[in-house]
Amino acid sequence: MNTATGFIVLLVLATVIGCISADFQGSFEPYEEEDAERIFRRSTCTPTDQPCPYDESCCSGSCTYKANENGNQVKRCD
């Protein structure tokens, strides 16, 4: 085994040991349930002033009737 190969082996070994010790320290803990729900809701909810068929799909959690550009009343997220 020459010097370059030995250096590469030591580098890989140090990386593996570093990953294992980081895992033992809790660096890879999963999200709490509430955090996961908040992230999911943010990625799937309807933003403000967008049409909303259901109140629960809005990021704010509520819809109201508002006039659109044609003067018609449509439900939009608050």
From Swiss-Prot:
Propeptide feature: residues: 23-40
| Miscellaneous note of the record | Several paralogs that code for the same precursor are shown in this entry, whereas other paralogs are shown in AC S0F1N4 and AC S0F1M8.
Q: What is this protein called in UniProt?
A: Omega-hexatoxin-Hi1g
Q: Which cysteines are joined by disulfide bonds?
A: 45-59, 52-63, 58-77
- Please describe the organ and tissue distribution of this protein's expression: Expressed by the venom gland.
Query: Which protein family is it in?
Result: Belongs to the neurotoxin 08 (Shiva) family. 01 (omega toxin) subfamily.
State the Gene Ontology BP annotations. Answer: defense response
Q: What start and end residues bound the annotated signal peptide? A: 1-22
The entry's keywords: Calcium channel impairing toxin, Cleavage on pair of basic residues, Disulfide bond, Ion channel impairing toxin, Knottin, Secreted, Signal, Toxin, Voltage-gated calcium channel impairing toxin
For the site labelled Critical for insecticidal activity, the residues are 51, 68, 76
Role summary: Inhibits insect, but not mammalian, voltage-gated calcium channels (Cav).
